[in-house]
Amino acid sequence: MRRVLSILLLLVAIASSRAGTHDGNDVVLLGDSNTWLGGDSCDNRRGWSWWFCSCYHPATCVSYARSGATWTNTPSTVRDITGYSETISDNNVIYNQIYRLVDAVRTGVQPIPELVVVMAGTNDAWFCTKRPYALSETADEAFSRTLPACASEAVTLASSVRLACDILMRELPSSRIVLITPMQSVSAGADAIAAVSAIIADCGQRIGLPVIRLDTDGCVKADMERRHRTYTYDGNHTNTEGARCIGEYIARAIDNISDK
């Protein structure tokens, strides 16, 4: 009897330890500097991606994120899968990260991801002079128009999110997509982050994609960071503790989405 009980307890322990593991799942991350901090292989603890992997346990996790990236395109944005930039520029956009991913899948470099996570929006809010049309259109207005044919025709945040997600869903129809709003930022300002996040959330709802709201539910609070750096090193980018907090939160949130 004791032996049977011991075996049962062992099985329960094994099952518990496997909870939240996704050994067969390939994951891809798109985004800006806070995702880029974790490195392309998600092996740097300064980025939330390392902590996400340690909690979510995917088979693979590859980041296509770039520092300075925005959702919002410009009239000069063109498809570019070879250029590299760590600052805000016409082609440093989620649109081109998606096409780099698509090219990697087509050439066999990247397995078809089971999950694609897009966390961006800070730079759209922060560098409004570089993306002057970003907040000039609501999600309702963007979706009332014909889908833009190319990036240079999608120069608002809402139209850029719509176009990018349409490409992702068309090119990777079997992949789950999760959108994440930017965390709060001292430099970007509360109003701008809130406006950007609301548009991303509205677009996600329109498309039918789940959205995780870091701006409201994340551990980084701009007022707190302004007084004392707790989860960031500069008020905008995570330190190791902030990366841990956000990465583990995102892993749990995605698990909760999967369970529904």
Residues of each region from the PLM?
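Short amphipathic alpha-helices and their capping/turn segments at secondary-structure boundaries
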Residues: 20-23, 46-54, 93-112, 165-169
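Solvent-exposed loop/turn segments at secondary-structure junctions
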Residues: 33-37, 66-72, 121-127, 183-187, ...
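Extracytoplasmic/secreted proteins, especially bacterial periplasmic and envelope-associated proteins
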Residues: 29, 47, 51, 100, ...
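Catalytic His-Asp segment of secreted/periplasmic serine-dependent ester chemistry enzymes
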Residues: 40, 79, 182-260
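Active-site segments of SGNH/GDSL-like serine hydrolases
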Residues: 119-123, 162-197
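Sec-dependent N-terminal signal peptides
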Residues: 4-13
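Oxyanion-hole/transition-state-stabilizing segment in secreted/luminal serine hydrolases
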Residues: 81-152
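Serine-esterase "nucleophile elbow" of acetyl-processing enzymes
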Residues: 16-80, 116, 225
